Amino acid sequence: MIEEKIKIPKWSIEQVAHVVRIAYKTIYNWIDQGLLDINVTDLPDHGIRRKRAKETRGTFSHGRSIEDRPAEISDRNTSGHFEADTVLSGKRKGQAVATFVERKSRLTIVKRLNGRDSTSMTKAILELANQLGDNLKTLTVDHGKEFANYNLIEEQTGVPLYFAHAYSPPERGSNENRNRVLRRFIPKGQPIDEITDDELIQINRYLNSRPLKCFNWRTPIEIFLRNLRY
């Protein structure tokens, strides 16, 4: 079970340790002793914390500032407030994916984009709004050019977009964190075009069925569905 959870849904050692009810240091010791068929490439970030990649997207400077976002959103007290971002393959052209992370539950929705342009992102957000309805209340984004159609998005969905300050990833910390987990399934350099729709669906399932320590080891989908009932 330990090897399966680390290699397939790509859980962290701490997540596995909680489920099997042993100390996470014990699992590390077993790996070091060669008792488990796990190596460093199977671990989150391959055991290495990497520097943030240099930003290559175009940007713009308009839109509603995150400073105007209600405090209840910042405090994660209410559901329905998402952060959005783009994850690229590492190539300058080709498909990408959009990631939408609900701030309260960390529910993560990954959608395919035909490109890194505003038309592709606008289509993805409109689809998301149609799927979630009233459960999509706001979006917090950066100033990447893919969000340049924010006026159109707000007009068609009624969902306000809040723009984080430039070079301030912590203002979209949920998105940054979940994107790092996503990279375990879509390594940088892997063409998004090679990922099938079924594989993308499975990645969404894996991301939302991972027990999180911040929720006392409940999963994002559990928290999200519970919030819908109250």
Language model segments and positions:
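C-terminal domain-tail junction helix/linker
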Residues: 188-230
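Secondary-structure boundary/capping micro-motif
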Residues: 1-166, 170-174, 184-191, 205, ...
